[in-house]
C-alpha cells in the first residue's frame, strides 16, 4: 500500500470547535503522518515502542490517573445495520432481543450507581442507525441533562446526527459523542455496507462544529492487516484536530455474527496499537475498551504502561461482558493508579 493512501473525505472531518491546549515542550503533535512512518512505529521492538509511548505519555499526563467511564445500553437490539461484529444487528441471530428506549429515571439511577462506584463519565448507547427527532430524542436530551446534574461528564453514541441534533445535544450539556471509524478505509467495506466511511466522518464533523468533544477509535481483530491498523490510527491522527478520546477495542467474537470465528486478539497486538495511538495523538485520552474481560491483570497494566489512560468501567459494555467494578478498583489500587476527576465544563 503506498504511503500516499488516504481517505478521500479526510477534509470533511475538520471541525474547528475543539482546540487542545498547547502541548508541553518536546511533545510533537502532528497531522501529516505517512503510512510508512506509522508502521515503522508499530513494528518497533516492543520494549522500545512502549518506552517511547510512555515517554510521550509522561510528558503530557503527569499524574498516575485514569479516566473511568461507564457505558449503558439505553436502547438495545433491533439495529437495521449490518456491522459484522455487532450482536445488536437485527439480521443476526445472536440472542439479543430488541428493546424499547429505557425510561429516563432508570437511566439516571444507573448513572448514579456508576458515579458511586467511581465512574466520572457516563456514556449512553442506542442501537440506532441515526437519531430521529421526536419523543425519543427528547428523552435522550433529558438523560443528558440529568447525568450532568449528577456532576458527571455525559457521553452518547446514537448513530448518525444532523447539525441541529448535534447542537441540541450540546445545549443539553453533552460532553462527548462517540462515533468510531471501526477500521481503515480500505478494510471498512469488508465489515459494513449500510453506512459509508464518509457518513462517519461527516457525523464527526457535525459533532465538532457543535462544540462537543469527539470520541473516536476502532476495533482490532476483525481480519484486518497491520497496514489496516496503522491506517486507522493514521486517519485519526491526520485530522485537523485529534479526537479527545480514542477507544481501542479488541473484537469480542459473538456467536451468530459474521465474525464469530475470529481468533482472540493477542495482548501484544493490543499493546502495539495503544502505544502507537499514544505517540500519534499525545494529548488524547486513549481508552482500553471492549475485550478487557479476556485480558489478565498484567496485560491490562501493560496497556496502561503503553499509554492507555481511560477505561470502560462496569460489568457490561452494551451487550458484552466487562470486569466488575470491584475488580477494576482493586487492580488500580494495586498499581497505585487513581481515578481521574471529571472535567469542569462551562
From Swiss-Prot:
[4Fe-4S] cluster binds at residues 79, 83, 86. [2Fe-2S] cluster binds at residues 123, 155, 215, 287. Residues 1-12 have a biased composition (Polar residues). Its cofactor is [4Fe-4S] cluster; [2Fe-2S] cluster. It is an enzyme of class 2 (transferase). SUPFAM superfamilies: Radical SAM enzymes (SSF102114). Residues 64-292 form the Radical SAM core domain. PANTHER family: BIOTIN SYNTHASE, BIOTIN SYNTHASE, MITOCHONDRIAL. Belongs to the radical SAM superfamily. Biotin synthase family. This is Biotin synthase. It comes from Myxococcus xanthus (strain DK1622).
Amino acid at each position: 500500500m503506498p504511503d500516499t493512501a488516504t481517505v478521500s473525505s479526510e477534509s470533511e472531518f475538520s471541525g474547528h470547535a475543539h482546540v487542545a491546549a498547547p502541548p508541553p515542550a518536546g511533545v510533537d503533535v502532528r497531522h501529516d503522518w505517512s503510512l510508512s512512518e506509522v508502521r515503522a512505529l508499530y513494528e518497533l521492538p516492543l520494549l522500545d515502542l512502549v518506552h517511547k509511548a510512555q515517554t510521550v505519555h509522561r510528558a503530557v499526563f503527569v499524574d498516575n490517573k485514569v479516566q473511568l467511564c461507564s457505558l449503558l445500553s439505553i436502547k438495545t437490539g433491533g439495529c437495521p445495520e449490518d456491522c459484522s461484529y455487532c450482536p445488536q444487528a437485527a439480521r443476526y441471530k445472536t440472542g439479543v432481543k430488541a428493546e424499547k428506549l429505557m425510561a429516563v429515571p432508570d437511566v439516571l439511577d444507573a448513572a448514579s450507581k456508576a458515579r458511586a462506584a467511581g465512574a466520572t463519565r457516563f456514556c449512553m448507547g442506542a442501537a440506532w442507525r441515526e437519531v430521529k427527532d421526536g419523543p425519543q430524542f427528547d428523552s435522550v436530551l433529558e438523560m443528558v441533562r440529568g447525568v450532568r446534574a449528577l456532576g458527571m461528564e455525559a457521553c452518547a453514541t446514537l448513530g448518525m446526527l444532523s447539525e441541529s441534533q448535534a447542537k441540541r445535544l450540546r445545549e443539553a450539556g453533552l460532553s462527548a459523542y462517540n462515533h468510531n471509524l471501526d477500521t481503515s478505509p480500505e478494510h471498512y467495506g469488508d465489515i459494513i455496507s449500510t453506512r459509508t466511511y464518509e457518513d462517519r466522518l461527516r457525523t464527526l464533523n457535525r459533532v465538532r462544529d457543535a462544540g462537543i468533544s469527539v470520541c473516536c477509535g476502532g476495533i482490532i481483530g476483525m481480519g484486518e492487516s497491520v497496514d489496516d491498523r496503522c491506517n486507522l490510527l493514521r486517519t485519526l491522527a491526520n485530522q485537523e484536530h485529534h479526537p479527545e478520546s480514542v477507544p481501542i477495542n479488541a473484537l469480542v467474537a459473538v456467536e451468530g455474527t459474521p465474525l464469530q470465528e475470529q481468533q482472540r486478539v493477542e495482548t501484544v497486538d493490543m499493546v502495539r496499537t495503544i502505544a502507537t495511538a499514544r505517540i500519534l495523538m499525545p494529548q488524547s485520552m486513549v481508552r482500553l475498551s471492549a475485550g478487557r474481560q479476556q485480558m489478565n491483570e498484567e496485560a491490562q497494566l501493560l496497556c496502561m504502561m503503553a499509554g492507555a489512560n481511560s477505561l470502560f468501567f462496569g460489568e457490561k459494555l452494551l451487550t458484552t461482558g466487562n470486569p466488575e467494578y470491584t475488580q477494576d478498583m482493586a487492580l488500580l489500587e494495586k498499581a497505585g493508579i487513581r481515578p481521574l476527576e471529571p472535567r469542569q465544563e462551562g
